[in-house]
Amino acid sequence: MVFGEFFHRPGQDEELVNLNVGGFKQSVDQSTLLRFPHTRLGKLLTCHSEEAILELCDDYSVADKEYYFDRNPFLFRYVLNFYYTGKLHVMEELCVFSFCQEIEYWGINELFIDSCCSSRYQERKEESHDKDWDQKSNDVSTDSSFEESSLFEKELEKFDELRFGQLRKKIWIRMENPAYCLSAKLIAISSLSVVLASIVAMCVHSMSEFQNEDGEVDDPVLEGVEIACIAWFTGELAIRLVAAPSQKKFWKNPLNIIDFVSIIPFYATLAVDTKEEESEDIENMGKVVQILRLMRIFRILKLARHSVGLRSLGATLRHSYHEVGLLLLFLSVGISIFSVLIYSVEKDEHKSSLTSIPICWWWATISMTTVGYGDTHPVTLAGKIIASTCIICGILVVALPITIIFNKFSKYYQKQKDMEVDQCSEDPPEKCHELPYFNIRDVYAQQVHAFITSLSSIGIVVSDPDSTDASSVEDNEDAYNTASLENCTGK
């Protein structure tokens, strides 16, 4: 008998409802079920046709007036106890998810769980949710790693059908997998060094010490570094493109698109500078050149090819669009509310710079994100109170989705690290040798042939097998052992 269960004995004049739940039969008063008319059994009593009854139960016997449900009879005892007592009780040995699904089927809300069981029930449910999420994340990580390994092997198989397949295969592996060998590591280090040098050169370009009066770079060293970096990026992209097993899949890789975008500004700027235009278009062409030069900042994204953290960040943002959208929604609502409030109390102050709602939007944005530039600030007491509330709300609003995003980032980062460890621990594809093949019959024939040859060499000839005595058998065994030892020594 489950906790709190007791069987109600109806009087003779009371009409009963016959229930059959997975073989467990029970007769219940109609008045007991009608206490909760929004549950499945309560709705069952209000049905006026057999079709409506069969929508709520699995079968119905007109002769016996029995309703059949293909459900767990053990869990139904807890449901039946709820109709008698008005409270749900959850035993420790029950699965919380199974119990939750069962009461959801019967139309019973979790709010009916008694106070003695509700706290523990919610704790177990949250623990199960966390474990289930971790398990799914691990399964996804394992499946993704397996799929990526399978795709890598399939890509290697394609080289056998291509022209210069073996050469392209060696180049492609060294360009894509820095952990493959020493030369692959040197290529990765060189590429990373060139990216960093290009970023440093781009920053130095903006310094006035290296520019002439027209704002152009007037330093041959910086120009040489820029040309050398672009030559490296172009050559690297061309080699990857030529060695790739599939040109279509090559351009679907975001990292390859970043490589292509990083070199476009240089060649576009070069084409614009060499093109002769009329005086009217010089100003417009200059603006285009400036924009193209600013696009060189995309080179910094090339670091994602060599950085586990950047790749994990990209995967996290790609799979956390819901949380990021929720964060932007919270901030937008808060900015709209506090900008109007601060404008209403600061607009009449002459010393205040918060004289329009767009300016108040800017102030609310930097306040809710806890940046606080200090260029605009309230001067009235009411404005300072609103500002304090805005900052506190900003901390709370930003902190809510950030935790979820951080957990996902940790998962993807660990996944990327595990994949790198797997790549380093596995033998390179070219170094994997097949297991040696042995034919037992051939090996046995060779051993017998060597044994007969050794017998002939020491003068032992067996003419008649029936005349063989014990001493000859012992001699044969000694000879066999000697021959086997010589054969093993020779090998």
From Swiss-Prot:
UniProt topological domain (Cytoplasmic) ranges: 1-182, 244-254, 307-321, 414-491
Database matches in Pfam families: BTB_2 (PF02214), Ion_trans (PF00520)
TM region(s), chain numbering: 183-204, 221-243, 255-275, 286-306, 322-343, 385-413
SMART domains xref list: BTB
Molecular function GO terms recorded: voltage-gated potassium channel activity
Intramembrane bits: 358-369, 370-377
Chain ranges on the Extracellular side, renumbered to this chain: 205-220, 276-285, 344-357, 378-384
Gene3D superfamilies, sorted: 1.10.287.70, Potassium Channel Kv1.1, Chain A, Voltage-gated potassium channels. Chain C
Keywords: Cell membrane, Ion channel, Ion transport, Membrane, Potassium, Potassium channel, Potassium transport, Transmembrane, Transmembrane helix, Transport, Voltage-gated channel
Primary location: membrane
Subcellular location: Cell membrane
Described purpose of this protein according to its UniProt entry: Potassium channel regulatory subunit that modulates the delayed rectifier potassium channel activity of KCNB1 by namely slowing down the deactivation and inactivation time constants. While it does not form functional channel on its own, it can form functional heterotetrameric channels with KCNB1.
Subunit structure, interactors included: Heterotetramer with KCNB1. Does not form homomultimers.
Domain writeup: The transmembrane segment S4 functions as a voltage-sensor and is characterized by a series of positively charged amino acids at every third position. Channel opening and closing is effected by a conformation change that affects the position and orientation of the voltage-sensor paddle formed by S3 and S4 within the membrane. A transmembrane electric field that is positive inside would push the positively charged S4 segment outwards, thereby opening the pore, while a field that is negative inside would pull the S4 segment inwards and close the pore.
Protein family membership: Belongs to the potassium channel family. S (TC 1.A.1.2) subfamily. Kv9.3/KCNS3 sub-subfamily.
Full protein name: Delayed-rectifier potassium channel regulatory subunit KCNS3
Species this chain originates from: Mus musculus
